[in-house]
């Protein structure tokens, strides 16, 4: 119930925010003031470190959210099933470990992204083509880390949910029939691979990210 309510609330807020942005853009465009809704100006005027910081934050926070949600889902089933079948408590801790690995993926990638940061001062750039090229490279690096952080965070969020739900089913099935545990564990391993895929894509996305005034 709680998980469903959180998902519905998140979806509602996302839809409302999207409609507000679209409505504002359409209003300015249809009223002849489209220049006031300049997304390009916003993207090029903001600091690339801001985008990189947001990417790092999303990578860590969404991964921890997915891990916590998965542990909550699995843990409640293990505790409930363990009342009638105490033998399931120990071996079903594997599901908890899989969920915890999701958070570890996010932490590792956050450190990888932080390692790519370096000092960059826009005002020190020369007003030449080389200066514009350096600015473009730093802006692109910020966007890369932002996109990589979103990729890792969302992948780990979905991975944590999948592992938690499958782990919950594994605990209940194991309590009823011990022969089912290994079969469901295979499904859980494939579910946990989603987070690994997100890590790999995040590394590929940020492979060429480079900050600095040179």
Curated annotation (Swiss-Prot):
GO cellular-component term (any): proton-transporting two-sector ATPase complex, proton-transporting domain
InterPro entries: ATPase_proteolipid_c-like_dom (IPR002379), F/V-ATP_Csub_sf (IPR035921)
Residues carrying the site annotation Essential for proton translocation: 100
Biological process annotations from GO: embryo development ending in birth or egg hatching
Disruption of the gene: reported phenotype: RNAi-mediated knockdown causes embryonic lethality. Causes defects in alae formation in the few surviving larvae and impairs yolk uptake by the oocytes from the pseudoceolomic cavities. Causes an increase in the section of the excretory canal, which often has multiple lumens and abnormal whorls.
Lumenal compartment spans: 1-9, 73-93, 166-183
Tissue spec. comment: Expressed in the H-shaped excretory cell, rectum, and a pair of cells posterior to the anus.
Transmembrane annotation, as ranges: 10-30, 52-72, 94-114, 145-165, 184-204
Keywords, in A-Z order: Hydrogen ion transport, Ion transport, Membrane, Transmembrane, Transmembrane helix, Transport
One MF annotation (Gene Ontology) recorded for this entry: proton transmembrane transporter activity
Cytoplasmic side: 31-51, 115-144, 205-214
One Pfam short name: ATP-synt_C
Membrane topology annotation: Multi-pass membrane protein
Location(s), subcellular: Membrane
Subunit structure, interactors included: V-ATPase is a heteromultimeric enzyme made up of two complexes: the ATP-hydrolytic V1 complex and the proton translocation V0 complex. The V1 complex consists of three catalytic AB heterodimers that form a heterohexamer, three peripheral stalks each consisting of EG heterodimers, one central rotor including subunits D and F, and the regulatory subunits C and H. The proton translocation complex V0 consists of the proton transport subunit a, a ring of proteolipid subunits c9c'', rotary subunit d, subunits e and f, and the accessory subunits vah-19/Ac45 and vah-20/PRR.
Function, as annotated: Proton-conducting pore forming subunit of the V0 complex of vacuolar(H+)-ATPase (V-ATPase), a multisubunit enzyme composed of a peripheral complex (V1) that hydrolyzes ATP and a membrane integral complex (V0) that translocates protons. V-ATPase is responsible for acidifying and maintaining the pH of intracellular compartments and in some cell types, is targeted to the plasma membrane, where it is responsible for acidifying the extracellular environment. The V-ATPase is required for the function of the excretory canal. Involved in receptor-mediated endocytosis.
Similarity field: Belongs to the V-ATPase proteolipid subunit family.
Record-linked PANTHER family: V-TYPE PROTON ATPASE PROTEOLIPID SUBUNIT
Protein name from the UniProt record: V-type proton ATPase 21 kDa proteolipid subunit c''
Gene name per UniProt: vha-4
